[in-house]
């Protein structure tokens, strides 16, 4: 049996990832870009929605998880959809409201995502394409169904692994990775439903449905993807003519771990300037702020204050999002 003094940081990280199941990136600002957790949310807005973002989790912790991504989504044949939204190139000196959500008509949407997720010596790159169909249930409510297909590359970076203390004890998992046998490509399928109107939403999505059934590459190390479920919901409520509040939730589940529950409250001023707070059960308290910089650009920042056992080692987490709205 290995003693703590013989275990390297990378083995600790591997064990931690297996236990905590952080196989999928975590997004504090999920409420502002639900497309990243549900392909059914592709094309909700009638313009080309481009997002680039970066996230540093557990700042101050050596080899902490880092995530960066870019996404783009758009309805097909957008020119046939009439919208009051008409973004310009200039920066705005006044209030720029959120674009409207149009319901009551059939539409199709496509999108793509590129995600780079790294934690310690482990790196995951994934390129994904999505398609969604939006069905009008009534004039005010739509139900969309989205699918995704992606290719993920899971790599063990041998040069980033450092052994804390030498040991003669044989550990097959550790030996397999440090022999540079960790480069596997895995096909990923996902799907999701998204019910929405101008003021409310409810979604359910599943990711990594194929697990590791379809894989290829030069490695023999065992990357073991698990099916992930995401359930989201929220409703926008007016407080007065200038303020709205949106209570929302995100539930994440991966067998056999316990569900992760996140509750969020977003306060928005004239659909232009917003702030939000989230509580991630036994993990973090999150503060967020953002605004529409102009008719074309939007910005969001969040800070995670850890309340887990890692709070004494980490100064928190940071996430920055820049959105570009193209008409």
PLM-predicted stretches and their roles:
Residues 1-3:
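N-terminal hydrophobic targeting signals that begin at the initiator methionine
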Residues 5-15:
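Sec-dependent N-terminal signal peptides
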Residues 17-21:
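Sec/Tat signal peptide C-region and signal peptidase I cleavage site
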Residues 22-327:
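Subset of outer-membrane beta-barrel
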């Amino acid at each position: 049996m290995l003693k703590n003094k013989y275990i390297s940081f990378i083995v600790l990280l591997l064990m931690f990832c297996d236990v905590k199941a952080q196989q999928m990136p975590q997004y504090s600002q999920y409420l502002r870009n639900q497309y990243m957790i549900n392909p059914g949310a592709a094309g909700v807005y009638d313009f080309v929605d481009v997002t680039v973002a970066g996230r540093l989790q557990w700042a101050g912790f050596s080899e902490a998880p880092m995530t960066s991504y870019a996404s783009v989504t758009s309805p097909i044949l957008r020119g046939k959809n009439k919208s009051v939204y008409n973004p310009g190139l200039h920066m705005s000196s006044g209030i720029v409201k959120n674009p409207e959500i149009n319901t009551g008509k059939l539409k199709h949407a496509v999108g793509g995502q590129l995600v780079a997720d790294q934690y310690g010596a482990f790196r995951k790159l994934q390129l994904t394409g999505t398609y969604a169909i939006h069905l009008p249930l009534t004039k005010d409510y739509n139900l969309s169904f989205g699918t995704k297909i992606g290719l993920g590359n899971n790599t063990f970076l041998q040069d980033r692994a450092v052994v804390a203390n030498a040991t003669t004890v044989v550990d097959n998992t550790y030996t397999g990775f440090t022999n540079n046998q960790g480069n596997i490509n895995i096909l990923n399928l996902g799907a999701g439903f998204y019910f929405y109107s101008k003021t409310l939403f409810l979604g359910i999505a599943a990711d990594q449905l194929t697990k590791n059934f379809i894989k290829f590459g030069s490695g023999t190390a065992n990357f073991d993807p698990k099916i992930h479920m995401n359930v989201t919901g929220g409703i926008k409520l007016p407080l007065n003519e200038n303020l709205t509040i949106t209570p929302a939730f995100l539930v994440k589940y991966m067998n056999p771990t316990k569900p992760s529950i996140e509750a969020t409250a977003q306060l928005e001023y004239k659909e232009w300037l917003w702030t939000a707070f989230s509580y991630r059960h036994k993990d973090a308290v999150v503060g967020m702020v953002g605004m529409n910089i102009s008719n074309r650009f939007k910005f969001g920042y969040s800070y995670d204050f850890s309340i887990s056992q890692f709070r004494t080692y980490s100064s928190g987490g940071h996430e920055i999002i820049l959105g570009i709205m193209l008409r």
